[in-house]
Amino acid sequence: MPSNLPDLSTLCDILIVGAGPAGTAAAITAVRQGLNVTIIDKAVFPRDKCCGDGLTTLALRELEKLRFDPATVPSWTDIDAAWLRSPSGRELRLPMPNNGKFAAVTPRVELDNALVIQARSEGVTIVEDCTYESMAVNSESVCVSVNLKNTPQQITASWVIAADGMWSPVRKSLGLSESGYLGEWHAFRQYANNVTGVANERLIVWFEKDLLPGYAWSFPLPNNRVNIGFGVVRDGKRRIQDMKDVWTDLLQRPHVVEALGPDFVMEDRHTAWPIPARIDEAITGSGRVLFVGDAAMATDT
């Protein structure tokens, strides 16, 4: 093993695969109970993650339980109201309660990095550029094979938490993945800048006739930027590969252009991702392995 790499052979109480919000939240919670926790992630932080960037009331309450400080996120934007547009064109403002925080927007690249920093500060060992390969489970522990910067290593843990997303390599390696499963929903998003219309300060949800029961959104960020996108249910009635054409059309609709302003500029490339939302049917644990977040298909719960 190269001398500049950490030795991961020491036994830990919990090994978590994936340093997204589900993984870091589990790690922070466990380390506060006096457990020895290690997280591995194939990425190097900060890294982006395809997401709408909106934080619901439940998400904010969970962050409060972690004693997370929004001030550690440069682009954190509190939301005081949601603006909805019906398929018929009627617009409605829904104010948030004024006795706390009930919605916010923050880029995942910033939020996830801030949670990684907090987890490290509380004693969690986080190993980046470390890819999960396989595991061997026995009655007392789990031996996990990983690839750390192209160097094979093994980690032994009493328990494993798989927070490794929709495609969950851990779930797949245990033979628990459903063949052909692509999620219940599919979403598409991109960032825009030079937003001079009302979208630069409003959280907007458009219920478009052709997207129902899905919807489109524009979530405000600092410096006249927004996260804009749409999501549709996988019901077999539309081809997911046609989403790019839907996106092009959506950005030309008069009410969307009016909200963004005439000179908005789309940034970089668009991204799309599947959304698993069937936790009631999902296998959330197997022996010494637990699944959380998207790996547990827990969207919207």
Model-predicted segments: where are they?
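Glycine-rich FAD pyrophosphate-binding loop
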Residues: V31-C51
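FAD/FMN-dependent oxidoreductases across multiple families
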Residues: G236-T301
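Predominantly flavin-linked oxidoreductase catalytic cores and closely associated redox partners
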Residues: Q118-E258, E281
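A conserved beta-strand/loop capping segment in the N-terminal third of enzymes
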Residues: L60-N113
